[in-house]
Amino acid sequence: SSLNYESLDSNKISNIIENLKNNIFKSDKIGYGSERHLFATAITPDGIITYADQLSSEFKKKYVLTGGPGFGKTDILKFIGSSGQKKGYFIEYMHDPFVPERIEHIFIPETSTCIITNNEINQANYTGIEYNLFDYTKSALSTSKKDDIKYNSDLFYELINKGISLIHNAHLLHDELESY
């Protein structure tokens, strides 16, 4: 993820943040907005399951951030969420199931707006006003960095699948033990 993060153009990312902030929060409200923290995606014995599509189905405006690990999705979401709260809006933060400190999606019910992510964990293909963060990098990655990213990605998915397999087996054993 650090390889991707190094390639981001901070000026372009700042433009995304300002654009989103101005489009979502057209007026200020009185006071500081409250927040709620939840998970929309989970690691289960049956694999990775996400409910972001169902949770976002009633929202009129959907922004989609697409990008792999290290593309700054959490930073963007935290900034937009914090800005919304400062302007008085209630923000729902959906956390990443692997690293709960990271944010996967945010929902702003008062404006019927959400920012959801297509990412390496949920592997979803959400539709909406899309920002493909790969388009906001400084320049083409060197071949060695591409090779490192590919290796890391392959290893990540191999370990994820192994972990899910172990959770699945533990679940089966748990069910068997409970039958006694």
Protein language model regions, located:
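N-terminal pre-Walker A segment at the start of P-loop NTPase domains
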Residues: 13-55
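N-terminal start-of-chain detector that recognizes signal peptides
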Residues: 34-39, 78, 85-89
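A broad, low-specificity signal for short, low-complexity segments enriched in glycine/proline
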Residues: 24-27, 72-79, 96
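Accessory recognition modules or surfaces
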Residues: 49-53, 59, 108-112
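An accessory alpha-helical subdomain
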Residues: 1-28, 148-180
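Conserved nucleotide-sensing/catalytic segment adjacent to the nucleotide-binding pocket
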Residues: 1, 83-161
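Glycine-rich phosphate-binding P-loop
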Residues: 49, 59-84
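Anaerobic metallocofactor- and corrinoid-dependent redox/one-carbon enzyme cores
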Residues: 48-54, 77, 118-127
